């Protein structure tokens, strides 16, 4: 059964592309028509491509893989964080810090620093410091959490990255390509879909479209996680039965 349908995509405004003057020629196969100087995305293709992307995400998570959700444009920030948290995956919704993938060890040391500060704060160590110093450290925690809070539990490179707008996340895209991390992304009519392993033709500016696609990604993760839990329960049950026997 398809992940979504044309009606759902239409209601989310996923079919509205950019002005025809701003298009990327590689998107031609995903464009249905032009209307009032705007490209209209072929939603039949979107249904198929979204299905492929969701199946891939499901497969990765089924094998114990992790997904990093990336979307730093204003209209995506809150939605992306919400959906990533809902499925227990990592996210970046503020600025992409250069080197997150290509210099992961250095980034990891910053995360370790953040975690140490949070531990000290939780233990009440800040209460023994001068007020100004304690406030400065609390502000440092808040600052680091803004940029790294969504992936501070990430101990290795993600197995796949989901991107809301590739034209906005060029550094993330380049780092993923360099490190061989597969990309799933929403591609509007101004994007090059060839830069993405699993492109999803869609309006990437409308909040409803972003919400719809992000929620489908999260649903695919949750579905795989639930299937893993069932398998673990069955395996445990079989092992206990064998032991009892």
UniProtKB/Swiss-Prot annotation:
GO MF annotation list: structural constituent of ribosome
GO CC aspect terms: cytosolic small ribosomal subunit
GO biological process: translation
Assigned keywords, A-Z: Ribonucleoprotein, Ribosomal protein
HAMAP family named in the record: Ribosomal_uS2_B (MF_00291_B)
Similarity remark: Belongs to the universal ribosomal protein uS2 family.
NCBIfam families membership: rpsB_bact
Record's protein name: Small ribosomal subunit protein uS2
Organism: Dehalococcoides mccartyi (strain ATCC BAA-2266 / KCTC 15142 / 195)
Encoding gene (name): rpsB
